[in-house]
Each structure stands twice: as C-alpha cells, then as structure tokens.
Regions:
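Radical SAM enzyme [4Fe-4S]-AdoMet core and its adjacent flexible, acidic
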Residues: 32, 119-132, 136, 140-265, ...
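Flexible mid-to-C-terminal extensions adjoining Fe-S/redox cofactors in radical SAM and related proteins
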Residues: 276, 282-370
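Short glycine-enriched, charge-decorated loop/helix-capping segments at active-site entrances
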Residues: 19-24, 118-125, 340-342
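Non-cysteine beta-strand/loop elements that form the S-adenosyl-L-methionine
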Residues: 2, 93, 97, 101-113, ...
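Internal, well-ordered domain-core segments that constitute the primary functional module
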Residues: 62, 77, 97, 103-106, ...
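Conserved alpha-helical substructure of the radical SAM core
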Residues: 1-103
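Short, flexible loop/turn elements at secondary-structure junctions
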Residues: 4-6, 54, 83-87, 109-111, ...
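Structural preference for beta-strand elements that scaffold enzyme active sites
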Residues: 1, 45-49, 78-80, 104-106, ...
C-alpha cells in the first residue's frame, strides 16, 4: 500500500484512522523512495494500492512519475486506488487511460446522504453530492467501481436504504460493508473549523466514539443487508462483501478479503512518504512500524515481522486463540486490527460471536439459495 500524500486529505471524516497516526512531516511520496522500496520487493508479484489521505492530491505529474517507477519494476504489478472521488474528473480518467488503463478504482461512500454524514469537509459540510457526481462520470466512461461503506451508527437498521441508494449507480459493481469497530482511539486535536464535532464525538479517546458500533450491532446490520441483497436478487447486479468472501470461505476456497483470508496483516506492507514501512495501514503507528527503505534488508524480513517481534507476538497470540474454535476454518481469524483494539476491553468474545453469527446465517441460507 502506497500512502501517496500521507495523511493529507481534502475532507475530514470523523472516523479517519489515518489522521490519528503520527506524521512528523507533511510529504508526498517521491519516486526515489518508491524505487528503494521496489528494490526490497525483489521482483515478487505486487498488488499495489494507491491510498492516503486522498491519493489524487499528489497531482497527475507526480503520480505519473510514480507510475513510471512501477512500470520499470522487474516483477508483475497490478494497481488499484481508493479515493473519496471528489477530485476525480475527466482529466484524471484520461490520465489513467493513458498511464495505467486497467487500474481498479474504489470510492468511499457510506451509502445514502444520511449515512454519509461522517464524511464531511473541514467545516462539517456534506460531501455526498460531490461523490455521486464521480460515480455518474465513471458510468459515462464505461468504468466500474467498488464502493467501501463504513458501517457507522448512522446506517444501523437501514441496510435496505443503503444498498438501494448504491444500486442506482450503474458504475457500482462491488459494495464492501466495512466495520467501524473503534474502541479507545484518540483523535488528534487538529485546529480545524470542525474540531468541536470531533471533540463531541470522541472527547477523550476512551471507550467507543460516537460513530462506532459494537460487534453485535455490526453483525445485525450485515445480516439485514444479506437478507435484502438476497431477496432483491441483487447478486446479479453487484457483489456484496463480506458475503462473497464468507461463501468462498465456507466452500474452502481462498479469498483476498483479509478478514476471511489465511493471509493476514503481515502480507500487507505500507510505504509512507518519508520512507517508513509499516504493516497493514489499519494497524496503529508506531506500533506497526517495520523499518524504513534505508534500514530494511528485504521483503522477507518485513513479511515475517522480524523487525517488530512485539507485533508478531501480539498477532500470533490472537490467532492462537482460534485453535479449537468450531468456526476456525471458515472465520480464519477475523480482522486482527479490530481484535487488537478489543484486547482487554470485554468485547473480545462479542467480536467472535459476531463472526459466528454472520457465518452461520450465510451457511443456513446457502442450501435454500441452491
């Protein structure tokens, strides 16, 4: 994962985990830093995701320089990008058609306008209509997109509204319902016009912030979404995650969705603009720090977490707790960043219960669907 502009973004979502991380310098990722990182990769196949902050803030010229480095890499490379979509325009799509035609573009949008209320600008103004313009433009250009929906309290009990609002957009072919299971997370006190909203939602970084849900609430939302997706036979229109991955997992098949994959966070490596290298970007920094382009000796060292034995111990301990669980083969350990946040909070068992609840619901529905 390449953090092109670091934490810099053109909006200020209340729940953004990237803006909770320490960033000593405001930098853009430079070609020479990427080149050093690619040297560490040693020609192995790479699935590169352009991320931020907002990756489009880097601009077309600088992104073109980074694409040139990726094209010169000795191994196979696929590229995807996660954006809020606000800066996406015809010029950007022309650029991608020219520089990396098969790039996969994901857009973040929390369902309908009501659900998207935590995705605001720096004055707490809504961003929904700016994003939907990008979805319409993508359809006009014949491009498909995946949408990540963060399941906050704003959309609990409204799964049908959320899915119906997204299904109206021709470009949307994948919808991923991502949990917002924040607990004991501290928001940085940025001097922005909407800092008061963050202080109200998350005053002291203790317990559950105002946007988050419990694992059980998330499970109920997922089941509600699955029922609506099935009843409307929308599986022919768009893929709904995590259910595609749950079905594959129940069938003993691999999936790329980390939460239901045997390949966990160590298989995700994040490059920051200043050359720092971390594990999955969903893990907090500096706790997930693995080194830098100047200190790392190779990708094997990074993937095995040799440079951060404490992180390796913590993640291994979580997976060890799965031994003997009736759902171990289908659950595959869940999302380790969420489980780490819940350690010692009393929510550990509820997290596992949510996983079993969702898996059992899907498993029971499969014979009927067949």
């Amino acid at each position: 994962m390449l953090k092109l502009p670091g934490e810099m973004c053109n909006i200020n979502c209340h729940y953004c985990y990237e803006r909770r991380k320490p960033y000593p310098n405001a930098l853009m990722l430079k070609p020479e830093v990427l080149r050093e990182f690619l040297t560490l990769c040693g020609g192995r196949p790479l699935a590169v995701e352009l991320h931020g902050g907002e990756p489009l803030l880097i601009g077309r010229r600088k992104m073109g320089d980074l694409f040139a480095e990726l094209r010169s890499y000795e191994g196979p490379v696929t590229v995807s990008m996660q954006t809020n979509g606000i800066l996406l325009n015809e010029a950007w799509l022309d650029f991608f058609d020219r520089e990396w035609p098969d790039i996969e573009i994901g857009i973040s949008l929390d369902g309908d306008e009501q659900g998207n209320a935590h995705r605001v600008d720096f004055r707490d103004r809504p961003t929904y209509r700016k994003v939907t313009k990008a979805l319409d433009m993508m359809a006009a250009r014949g491009r498909n997109v995946g949408v990540i929906v963060v399941v906050t309290r704003r959309i609990l009990g409204r799964a049908a509204d959320v899915l119906d609002s997204l299904s109206k957009f021709e470009a949307v072919k994948v919808v991923k319902l991502s949990g917002c299971l924040d607990f004991n997370v501290r928001s940085k006190d940025y001097q922005t016009p909407n800092r008061k909203s963050l202080q109200i939602l998350n005053p002291d970084g203790v317990g559950m912030p105002g946007w988050a849900t419990t694992p059980d609430e998330y499970a109920d939302f997922l089941i509600e979404a699955f029922e609506h997706w099935s009843a409307t036979r929308s599986y022919g229109a768009y893929v709904l995650e995590p259910f595609f991955s749950v079905i594959r997992s129940l069938s003993g098949l691999p999936t790329s969705y980390t939460s239901f994959s045997d390949r966990k966070e160590p298989f995700v490596v994040t490059l920051y603009p200043d050359g720092r290298i971390g594990s999955s970007d969903e893990l907090s920094m500096p706790g997930a720090l693995l080194g830098s382009v100047d200190t790392a000796t190779g990708m094997d060292e990074l993937l095995t977490l040799d440079s951060n034995p404490g992180l390796r111990r913590d993640l291994s301990a979580l997976l060890a707790k799965c031994a003997g669980c009736s759902h171990e083969a289908s659950c595959r350990g869940g999302a380790l960043p969420d489980r780490l946040r819940f350690e010692g909070t009393g929510f550990e068992e509820e997290y596992c219960d949510y996983r079993r609840k969702v898996i059992d619901h899907v498993a029971a529905a499969l014979p009927a669907a067949a």
